[in-house]
């Protein structure tokens, strides 16, 4: 009886050890390929994304190897043929829209997380970005919640092209009554709101009487200028909520201005999406509170929902 029990224990122990060994070998054999430009016009943005990705990766304690490939002036299809192999469990990148279009044409067989979005799509490719369309959707929800029926739009001269996509997205997503104005009104009628599109310096110059039911965009918020009291805006939450130590660590290591802080947060969320897929590759629906907003992952797409805030005069509060 004693020998039989010992034999049974020995078999169970060996089975557990075997499963652990298989798991370990699987982890060692896995690899994540990251395709980002190291030079060229997008290199600075890519550097901040990489900074955020690596900081979140290090904080997570994951050991899966990362393979970095420079995409500048290189054909994406050729890069995939050259670097994707049996160990590649996921591809992250590219960043440029033209490269994402090339990526879709190449029809990758490995799950891929592109870091920009284009008109086309493939089931195997998740498109993840800091999209103006998502910013517009968050703003639309906020305006509806506040009972706004007519939105006055004040554009800083020279900034029209910069905000055109957000404005067009807002027009297409909302049934509000829109009106372009050349200067801020002295007061707003009931159910009227004012949307300012411009930079922080121009925002600070708007008369105080107009601040009630006033809204703006994320790039009008600056560390150098205090926003008007009561103004509302939608942005990546990590800038206002200290809930992600990896982003703080990345910033302390290499301080950058607020626009690049958003890209650090974006890189951190890109790693978290990657980690989620590696741990649950068959999952068809996942949600988490990310550094750049609420992230919803389905089998074929990723949806990011920025969060909205209000400046109270002493600080920013989550709405």
Segments from the language model and where they lie:
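Short, solvent-exposed amphipathic alpha-helices that sit
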Residues: 44-60, 135, 158-175
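Short beta-strand segments enriched in small/hydrophobic residues
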Residues: 31-45, 151-153
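Extracellular/periplasmic bilobed ligand-binding domains
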Residues: 104-112, 150-234
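Segments of small-molecule ligand-sensing domains
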Residues: 254-319
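Extracellular/periplasmic periplasmic-binding protein-like sensory domains
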Residues: 205-268, 278-282
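Short beta->alpha junction loops
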Residues: 65-79, 129-130, 155-157, 177-186
């Amino acid at each position: 009886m004693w020998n039989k029990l010992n034999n049974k224990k020995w078999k169970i122990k060996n089975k557990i050890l075997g499963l652990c060994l298989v798991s370990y070998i699987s982890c060692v054999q896995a690899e994540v390929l990251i395709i980002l430009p190291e030079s060229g016009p997008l290199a600075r943005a890519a550097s901040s994304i990489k900074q955020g990705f690596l900081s979140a990766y290090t904080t997570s304690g994951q050991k899966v190897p990362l393979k970095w490939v420079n995409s500048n002036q290189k054909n994406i299809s050729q890069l995939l043929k050259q670097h994707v192999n049996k160990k590649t469990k996921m591809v992250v990148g590219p960043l440029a829209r033209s490269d994402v279009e090339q990526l879709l044409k190449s029809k990758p067989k490995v799950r891929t997380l592109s870091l920009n979005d284009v008109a086309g799509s493939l089931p195997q490719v998740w498109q993840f970005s800091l999209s103006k369309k998502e910013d517009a959707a968050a703003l639309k929800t906020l305006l509806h919640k506040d009972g706004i029926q007519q939105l006055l739009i004040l554009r800083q001269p020279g900034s029209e092209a910069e905000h055109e996509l957000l404005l067009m997205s807002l027009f297409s997503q909302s049934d509000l009554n829109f009106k372009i104005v050349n200067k801020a009104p002295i007061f707003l009628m009931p159910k009227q709101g004012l949307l300012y599109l411009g930079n922080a310096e121009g925002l600070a110059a708007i008369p105080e009487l107009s601040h009630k039911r006033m809204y703006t965009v994320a790039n009008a918020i600056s560390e150098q200028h205090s926003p008007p009291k009561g103004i509302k805006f939608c942005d990546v939450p990590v800038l206002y909520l200290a809930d992600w130590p990896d982003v703080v660590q990345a910033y302390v290591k290499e301080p950058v201005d607020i626009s690049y802080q958003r890209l650090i947060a974006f890189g951190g969320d890109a790693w978290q999406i990657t980690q989620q897929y590696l741990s649950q590759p068959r999952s068809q629906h996942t949600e988490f509170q990310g550094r750049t907003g609420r992230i919803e992952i389905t089998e074929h797409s990723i949806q990011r929902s920025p969060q909205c805030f209000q400046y109270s005069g002493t600080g920013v509060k989550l709405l």
